[in-house]
């Protein structure tokens, strides 16, 4: 194994360890989609932050601010303006930002991120039976570090999905309206809930 491959393996191992330990302390992950929310996340005691906005000109600075505040930074690459849905955008995040990992719905992006040592979260929208039927195959194929399921309020679906992802940790997100959505998702087996609903960020 080449030195860069060894470094990538170690990088992912350390990121996984931190993610699992941090979600044990703080099960709600702030997801920021503008500069105002970014500042709120920086000031919070949450240790992991999802970045859901930015473009190729601003993402480096957004990530830098969060890293300077000691945060683990996960960039949703599908939402960054100016980045095409190609492997090269993953390489850009790896080489030109300090991000720890990515979120994506796209299998090839998750695979490439694994190759370059980024922590990976594959997001699934549980909108129909076909999505549910294919989740096991997709997860086996891409091998993400974490599976994310939307929306968060479907406790029964979270339990079913956990059976399909064969031991992968699951984060719930989307339509987190109140505390019961958070506690329900966690009680169903999710290790964390990510949300843009700022009043929910302080739930422990």
Where are these regions (language model features)?
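Conserved N-terminal beta1-alpha1 strand-loop-helix module at the mouth
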Residues: 2-73, 81-83, 98
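Surface-exposed amphipathic alpha-helices with a cationic face
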Residues: 19-21, 63-70, 94, 110-117, ...
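Short beta-strand/loop segments at the ligand-binding rim of alpha/beta enzyme cores
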Residues: 21-28, 69-78, 98, 116-125, ...
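Catalytic beta/alpha-barrel core
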Residues: 29-33, 48-56, 74-82, 98-107, ...
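Catalytic cores of alpha/beta
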Residues: 40, 88-93, 137, 156-167, ...
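Glycine-enriched alpha-helix->loop->beta-strand junction motifs that scaffold or abut catalytic
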Residues: 43-49, 96-99, 115-121, 140-146, ...
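Glycine-rich phosphate-binding active-site loops on the catalytic face of alpha/beta enzymes
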Residues: 51-53, 151-157, 174-181, 186-204
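Histidine/lysine/aspartate-rich catalytic loop segments that bind and position anionic ligands
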Residues: 107-139
């Amino acid at each position: 194994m080449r030195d860069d491959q060894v470094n990538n393996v170690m990088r992912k191992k350390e990121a996984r360890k931190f993610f699992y330990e941090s979600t044990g302390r703080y099960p709600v992950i702030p997801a920021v989609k503008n500069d105002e929310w970014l500042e709120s996340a920086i000031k919070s005691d949450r240790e992991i932050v999802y970045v859901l906005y930015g473009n190729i000109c601003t993402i480096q600075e957004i990530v830098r601010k969060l890293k300077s505040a000691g945060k683990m930074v996960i960039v949703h690459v599908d939402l960054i303006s100016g980045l095409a849905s190609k492997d090269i955008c993953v390489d850009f995040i790896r080489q030109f930002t300090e991000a720890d990992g990515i979120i994506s719905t796209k299998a090839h992006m998750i695979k490439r991120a694994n190759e370059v040592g980024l922590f990976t979260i594959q997001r699934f929208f549980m909108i129909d039976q076909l999505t549910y039927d294919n989740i096991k195959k997709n997860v086996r194929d891409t091998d993400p570090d974490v599976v994310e399921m939307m929306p968060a309020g479907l406790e029964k679906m979270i339990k079913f999905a956990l059976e399909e992802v064969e031991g992968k940790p699951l984060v719930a997100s989307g339509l987190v309206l109140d505390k019961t959505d958070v506690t329900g998702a966690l009680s169903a087996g999710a290790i964390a809930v990510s949300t843009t609903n700022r009043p929910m960020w302080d739930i422990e």
